[in-house]
Each structure stands twice: as structure tokens, then as C-alpha cells.
Regions:
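The substrate-binding groove and active-site-proximal loops of carbohydrate-active enzymes
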Residues: 25-36, 107-124, 150-163, 173-186, ...
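Active-site and substrate-binding clefts of carbohydrate-active enzymes
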Residues: 2-57, 62-105, 243-461, 485-567
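Short, solvent-exposed turn/loop segments enriched in Gly/Ser/Thr/Pro and often Arg
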Residues: 61-66, 148-150, 208-217, 404-408
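Acidic (Asp/Glu)-rich catalytic clusters
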Residues: 49-53, 128-145, 358-359
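Short, low-complexity intrinsically disordered segments enriched in A/P/G/S/L with frequent Arg
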Residues: 460-461, 471-475, 479-486
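CE4/NodB-like, metal-dependent polysaccharide N-deacetylase domain
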Residues: 162-211, 349-369
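Hydrophobic faces of well-ordered beta-strands that scaffold small-molecule active sites
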Residues: 8, 58-60, 144-146, 207, ...
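Hydrophobic, small-residue-rich alpha-helical packing segments that form membrane-like cores
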Residues: 222-225
Length: 567
């Protein structure tokens, strides 16, 4: 009998997208779709397992930006409106398809799904989806881990990198150790603010930390140790190419020189699931993501859900069928049977793998991380697959589901290894986020980080409190009727928010892939523009409070952000 472990880790993340200045905003749909198709189905799946006393051990990150959106009143109100529009559309679809039994059955399914989703979100959890995650964490079934504040790519924020050479994407800083620079404080602030948001949200300290894009470079372990992190994840080669080489390959954690343990992804196990070509989601029976009534039906029939724009609705009537062929209608029952068969196959493959590794004389841990949005959004049957993986794993005696924290508690003695610079992006390094299409971002981010560090140090320990002049009040009035230090604190907090939002790795990714390139570019420019305007006003003692209030209204995340981390 093996004593090995399988650790499943889900990374739930979306960039902060909130546009109160618009009644409808297309990119807010990313959030609405993820709640409907991914987060609520995953919560309900985990609750079913807990209620049925099925042994469940799962690790999951909920990034700070996602937590901020889940607790935002405006976005929750807009999500309910979105559900109401889907319910209206599918009610009309039931009528339109009344003479087509298979399409009518699918329309019935979507109508009932959206109604039940609304009941769950509004009635059961009072528009607070963080509550069930907290409750699952408290049962011990779910280990929630922290992540960086706005998903900044930490190695690229850690210190300035050349963006005009021939080797874009190759980490020239791979052997560097910690240095106190403004860029280093930018990475530190991302980690420590992310830790703080976790503590505010879950009233606990995180044991694990999800590095955005699994991107690691030397010296990050020191910041993670400062944040009291016990473990973090890497891609396979980040540990395999470490120094010295890990004795147990990627199948045991290794402590870093600063202290936190690094665990590595089992790439083959991951690809078996997420690859659309060779992996499970490409099965012909599964729902076709790209065939959507939002593109098939007339705009006037789509009604206010579309508000005159072609976009995904979430109502999809067809299955994968095959590449470049006519798409057949979707059969939910058949798709679920395939998911159950694949779940059994996945568990059996992991059993064989763990038995084989255990025969070498130690208790392995096979770590399989995924983007959470794969399950339900990109792969509609994913939550059903995952539920049956957990059920089958619970019934086998050859290995057990575990979390990295539990494994480390049971196996505290491990090798010390300096991991290699790495990411889980294409080709394993930085080229997705640092290439000719997006390299222009980083000099501006580093300049802003330099400015943030300067003002943080300058305002951290003022000698006396002086009234702050600003353009909306006479010079003898203190801004907002508040003490000057309190007003300065507001400005410094907003500076931190704008810098953090500009640093999101999502923007560089979207620019590289060409998906929402214009929107991503605009977001970077807008946040840096607001940052620079507030910086200039603060350093010239002439803050426009109306502009500050506008920034606070639009970019309202992290109310307790600690700007002193930039010192």
C-alpha cells in the first residue's frame, strides 16, 4: 500500500474590472460568467461532498482582486441584473424552441440553471459568495491560500530589467539575491498587501501562497518568509533545475534558503486535464465553448442582455463534436457520463504513478494545479469531473487526497534547494509577459514604483502636522475638514491602488495574446495617468480633492491598503 498524496490546487483569479462610470461594461461579463459557470458550481460541489461526509481535501487561491469584486455592492447588483437578463432570454428561448424537443430541453436546462443560480446567490448567501468559501475553509475540507495583491508578475516587478535587448523574456536576474530597491519594494508590497487582504477576508494567516503565473526568481522566498508563508507553488522546471538538484525530483517539497517550502507542478498530470487537444476537455461529447447564441441569434432577440453588441451569453446548444466539422447538439447526460469515466481514468493513472514513485522509498506528493476557471467556464463539465475525481480518490486505499500544508506537517524534514527562475507560461519563462508587444510597460511601472517609494519614505514619519493646501478649498482650510495627515493618508493609499492596478500581469498577457488588447492598454495608461497626477499634486502640496474622490470611487479596492510597504 502506498502512503503517497495527491494535492489538487485551484487558482481562482480575475483582474479587477469595475466601471461605475458606465451603465453596462462588456469586460465586467468576465466576472459574471465566472461566478455562474465556475465559482458557484465549485462551491456547491464542495458543499455536497462535505454534506455527504466524502473526504475532501482541496487547496484553492482566491486572489485579492477577485475577493474585492466578490464583496463589491455595485458588481453584485449588476450580477443579479445579468442573471435576470439571462432568465428572460432563456424563457424566450423555451418558447422559440417549443417545437424542437432537443433544443427545448436545452433551453429548459439553462432557464432552470440560471434561476437556481440566482436563488443560491441571492437567497442562500445574501449576495456574499465569500461566506461559503469561509465556511468550507472552517470545515478543514478547503485550504484557501493567498496571492499577490493584483497578480503582478513578481520577477518583473522585483527589479528593473532591460527591455531593449535581443533576449526579452530571459531573466537576467536569475541569480540575484534580495536588494533594497524601489522595484524590490514593489514586489514586496504585492506580496504583503496580498497577505493582508487574505487576513482581512478570512480572519486567519495564510499558510500557502500562489505566485502569479507560478513566476519565481531568487529573493522572492525572503519576502514570502517575511509574510510568514509556509509554502508556495512552482512549475516543474523551477524545482528540477534548482541548486542542488532535488533528491526526490518534483515529488517532495524543498525548503528554500529563506525558509518557505517550494512545491512543484506535475506537468503531465496537469496536461491530461487542461489540454484541449490531448486532454479530457476536448472530448467530442463536451459542450462547445465557442458556439454561443450570442453570436448565432439576431441581436433584437438577444434583447438587453447584448445591448447591441455581439458577445458570449453562456447559452450554448452544441457539443465539441470534432475539429472543423458541423457541431452536433449537446447532450448533457452523455457528457456527464464521459466526465465520470475520465475521472475514474485520472484517479487510476495517479494511483499507478504514486505506487511507482513510492517504490523508490519515500512518500511522494503529486501536485496538480489548475486555473479554477477551467472548471465550469472553459470546460463546462469540469466541476462534475472534479467531484467524481474526489469521490473515486476517497474510495481508494493506495493514496490520499491532501494539501501541501498537511503533507508538510506530516513530513517536516525536507531538502533545502534554491529554485530556478521560472514560470508556468509558454516555454517556462517570461516571454508571454515580456516581449516586443508589451515590453514598453515595464519602464513606466518601474518609474512609478520609484516615485511610490520616494513618497512613502517622505511621508512615513512627518515631524509636524501641517494643513494641506488643495485646489478645492481656500488655502487656510484643511482638506475635507480632516487633519492633514489623514488627507495625506488617503492620497498615499490611492497612489498605492493605482500602482497596484497598473502592475496586474493580466494586461501584459491580454496584449500579447491579442485578446482585449485595446482594453488592457487603456487600463495601464489610465492607472499610471491617475498615479502620476496624484503624485504631482501631492508633492507640490496642491491636491485636487474632487479628482481624488473620483479615483477612490472608481478604483475602490483594498480599503486598508498599507502604503508603508513601499518604504
Amino acid at each position: 500500500m502506498s502512503s503517497g498524496c495527491l494535492a489538487l490546487i485551484l487558482h481562482a483569479h480575475l483582474p479587477f474590472v469595475r466601471h461605475p462610470e458606465h451603465e453596462h461594461f462588456l469586460e465586467e461579463d468576465w466576472f459574471f460568467e465566472a461566478i455562474t459557470e465556475c465559482y458557484i458550481p465549485l462551491v456547491r460541489m464542495m458543499q455536497r461532498l462535505v454534506d455527504k461526509h466524502v473526504p475532501l481535501k482541496l487547496a484553492m487561491s482566491l486572489t485579492p482582486t477577485l475577493c474585492a469584486m466578490l464583496r463589491d455592492k455595485l458588481l453584485c447588483e449588476r450580477y443579479i441584473r445579468h442573471l435576470d437578463l439571462l432568465i428572460d432570454l432563456t424563457a424566450r428561448e423555451r418558447k422559440r424552441n417549443r417545437n424542437h424537443p432537443q433544443l427545448r430541453a436545452l433551453a429548459d436546462f439553462y432557464f432552470e440553471m440560471f434561476c437556481e443560480t440566482k436563488r443560491f446567490f441571492v437567497d442562500e448567501y445574501k449576495c456574499d459568495l465569500l461566506t461559503p468559501f469561509r465556511e468550507l475553509r472552517e470545515t478543514g475540507a478547503l485550504e484557501i491560500i493567498a496571492s499577490a495583491a493584483t497578480h503582478g508578475l513578481l520577477p518583473l516587478l522585483q527589479q528593473p530589467v532591460a527591455t531593449d535587448g535581443a533576449d526579452l523574456g530571459v531573466p537576467a536576474f536569475a541569480s540575484a539575491r534580495a536588494r533594497s530597491t524601489p522595484a524590490a519594494t514593489a514586489a514586496r508590497a504585492q506580496i504583503l498587501i496580498g497577505r493582508d487582504v487574505y487576513t482581512d477576508t478570512f480572519a486567519a494567516q495564510p499558510a500557502g501562497f500562489w505566485l502569479p503565473e507560478c513566476a519565481y526568481a531568487p529573493a522572492l522566498d525572503s519576502i514570502l518568509q517575511e509574510a510568514n508563508v509556509r509554502w508556495f507553488g512552482l512549475d516543474t522546471h523551477g524545482l528540477l533545475f534548482g541548486s542542488p538538484r532535488p533528491r526526490h525530483s518534483i515529488y517532495a517539497p524543498c525548503y528554500t534558503p529563506a525558509g518557505p517550502a517550494a512545491i512543484a507542478r506535475d506537468r503531465d498530470s496537469s496536461r491530461q486535464v487542461w489540454s484541449t487537444k490531448g486532454g479530457y476537455p476536448g472530448d467530442p461529447a463536451y459542450r462547445e465553448f465557442y458556439r454561443d447564441v450570442g453570436f448565432d441569434l439576431p441581436l433584437d432577440h438577444l434583447g438587453p442582455l447584448a445591448y447591441g453588441v455581439r458577445k458570449f451569453s453562456g447559452v450554448k446548444y452544441h457539443r465539441v463534436t470534432g475539429p472543423d466539422v458541423h457541431k452536433e447538439l449537446y447532450d448533457l447526460v452523455a457528457a456527464k457520463k464521459v466526465a465520470e469515466t475520465q475521472a475514474r481514468h485520472f484517479v487510476e493513472e495517479r494511483r499507478r504513478q504514486i505506487d511507482q514513485i513510492s517504490a523508490t522509498g519515500f512518500d511522494p506528493i503529486v501536485v496538480v494545479p489548475f486555473d479554477a476557471e477551467l472548471f465550469g467556464h472553459w470546460w463546462f463539465e469540469g466541476p462534475h469531473f472534479l467531484e467524481h475525481v474526489i469521490r473515486h480518490a476517497a474510495n481508494n486505499r493506495d493514496f490520499q487526497l491532501s494539501t501541501p500544508s498537511e503533507y508538510l506537517a506530516a513530513h517536516p524534514t525536507q531538502q533545502i534547494v534554491e529554485p530556478a527562475a521560472s514560470t508556468w507560461g509558454e516555454n517556462g519563462y517570461l516571454e508571454v509577459w515580456l516581449n516586443p508587444s508589451n515590453a514598453w510597460i515595464y519602464p513606466q511601472l518601474h518609474d512609478a514604483a520609484q516615485r511610490m517609494s520616494e513618497v512613502a519614505r517622505g511621508y512615513a514619519c512627518p515631524v509636524v502636522e501641517q494643513p494641506r493646501k488643495h485646489s478645492a478649498l481656500p488655502s487656510d482650510k484643511v482638506a475635507g475638514g480632516a487633519p492633514a495627515l489623514q488627507f495625506d493618508d488617503r492620497v498615499l493609499k490611492q497612489l498605492a491602488r493605482e500602482l497596484l492596478l497598473a502592475q496586474s500581469s493580466d494586461w501584459a498577457f491580454l496584449i500579447k495574446t491579442g485578446t482585449a488588447r485595446e482594453y488592457a492598454t487603456k487600463r495601464i495608461f489610465e492607472h499610471l495617468s491617475r498615479f502620476n497626477r496624484l503624485y504631482d499634486q501631492l508633492t507640490t502640496n496642491d491636491v485636487d480633492e474632487e479628482f481624488l474622490c473620483e479615483c477612490e470611487f472608481r478604483d475602490n479596492l483594498f480599503p486598508n491598503v498599507n502604503w508603508r510597504y513601499y518604504m
